[in-house]
């Protein structure tokens, strides 16, 4: 489903990824760990099509993912519907005037009928228990509430792959338990998870395969 072949990436003269080989099958839950600065966040930005390999190849469902490929609007629309990326800092992906508008934004951009937009929006608000926040501006919410909204936004697109960067960081215990339960359910539904985390409980309960990045910006499966 997802294949990286000898992928390298550098910011100007600073290497961030060094000859990464990775293959992820549909329905796997891959945990990525490693020290700060080893390239983990760069790797998931590349998987989400935000940046592209300096060397090597990235394939998703046998399609090579390149900057040129994602300039095709139809292909880019398909790819970004497949890939759900939840940033560690939810503020970077919340920009609408209300929670309801935020959750509905993706389905509207997909061109879905109004009835389906409403249904997806209501389902996702209800799933994360944020129905009562629907009229609130996202910037007025707590960190945990923002994380729930950002996940609701991604789930409204019904992605095949969910990519998360430290999803439990900074959350209270109750919210952590709720999100962990959701992620387990998402995975049990046959979807694919790729998660960066230092949280041992999350890794042990969610991971089916484990990858470690080192200070040389290399990745090894363990």
Residue ranges and their predicted role:
Residues 33-35:
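The feature captures the beta-strand-to-loop junction immediately N-terminal to the Walker
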Residues 162-165:
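Catalytic Walker B motif of ABC-type/P-loop ATPase nucleotide-binding domains
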Residues 115-133:
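Conserved ABC ATPase "signature" region
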Residues 197-198:
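H-loop/switch region of ABC-family ATPase nucleotide-binding domains
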């Amino acid at each position: 489903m997802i294949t990286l072949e000898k992928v390298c990436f550098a910011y100007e003269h600073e290497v961030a990824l060094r000859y990464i080989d990775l293959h992820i099958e549909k329905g796997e839950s891959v945990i990525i760990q490693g020290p700060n600065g080893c390239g983990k966040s760069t790797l998931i930005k590349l998987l989400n099509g935000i940046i592209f390999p300096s060397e090597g190849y990235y394939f998703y469902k046998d399609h090579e993912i390149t900057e040129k490929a994602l300039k095709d609007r139809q292909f880019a629309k398909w790819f970004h519907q497949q890939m759900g990326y939840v940033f560690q800092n939810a503020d970077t992906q919340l920009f609408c005037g209300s929670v309801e508008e935020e959750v509905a934004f993706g389905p509207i951009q997909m061109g879905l009928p109004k009835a389906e937009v409403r249904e997806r929006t209501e389902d996702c608000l209800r799933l994360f228990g944020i129905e009562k926040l629907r009229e609130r501006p996202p910037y007025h919410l707590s960190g945990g509430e923002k994380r729930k909204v950002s996940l609701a936004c991604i789930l409204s697109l019904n992605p095949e792959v969910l990519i998360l960067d430290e999803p439990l960081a900074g959350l209270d215990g109750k919210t952590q338990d709720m999100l962990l339960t959701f992620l387990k359910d998402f995975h049990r539904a046959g979807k694919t998870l790729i998660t960066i985390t230092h949280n041992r409980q999350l890794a042990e309960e969610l991971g089916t395969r484990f990858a470690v990045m080192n200070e040389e910006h290399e990745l090894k499966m363990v």
